Design a protein with these regions (language model features):
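Mitochondrial intermembrane space
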Residues: 14-147
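N-terminal Sec-pathway targeting helices
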Residues: 1-11
């Protein structure tokens, strides 16, 4: 009986330590949206100190979009410890083959109808500033530079 109690106690302590280890790591809020009119958006936000803060950042960012764009589909919204591919390139400021809205704390890649994507990118950057962002700019494909 004592051995069973010791084993249970060790499992509980191990579970608590594992939870705090995961909860206290830093995470990047990333998400992908697709719209009915052919646009795809990949968003990367600045690193958050905890998983809860990361999830809250994704929710704060996506809630107004989902409210205004009923035809938009959230492909994913997750918290990543490490980035790769397009998301890593956005974070690092590497040139990418799509338009990107750059604002403090946010990089948003846009792909869509070629005849309209530039105008939409510039409009989105202007809307972010109107909405309270300190600055935002549309960066054209292949022209991003590392900070």
């Amino acid at each position: 009986m004592k051995q069973a109690l010791v084993i249970v106690a060790l499992l509980v302590v191990g579970s608590v330590l594992a939870y705090y280890h995961v909860a206290n790591q830093s995470y990047f809020p990333v998400s992908k949206l697709a719209s009915a009119d052919g646009y795809t958006f990949h968003m990367v936000q600045d690193r958050r100190a905890q998983r809860n803060a990361c999830a809250e950042a994704n929710n704060r960012f996506l809630a107004p979009i989902k409210a205004r764009c009923l035809q938009c589909d959230v492909v994913y919204a997750r918290c990543e410890r490490e980035l790769q591919g397009l998301e890593l390139a956005l974070l690092m400021g590497d040139p990418v083959p799509v338009h990107v809205v750059v604002s403090p704390g946010l990089r948003l890649a846009m792909d869509g109808p070629k005849e309209r994507v530039r105008r939409e990118c510039e409009q989105l950057a202007a809307d972010l500033v109107k909405g309270g962002a300190p600055s935002a700019a549309c960066v054209f494909p292949g022209t991003m530079r590392r900070p």
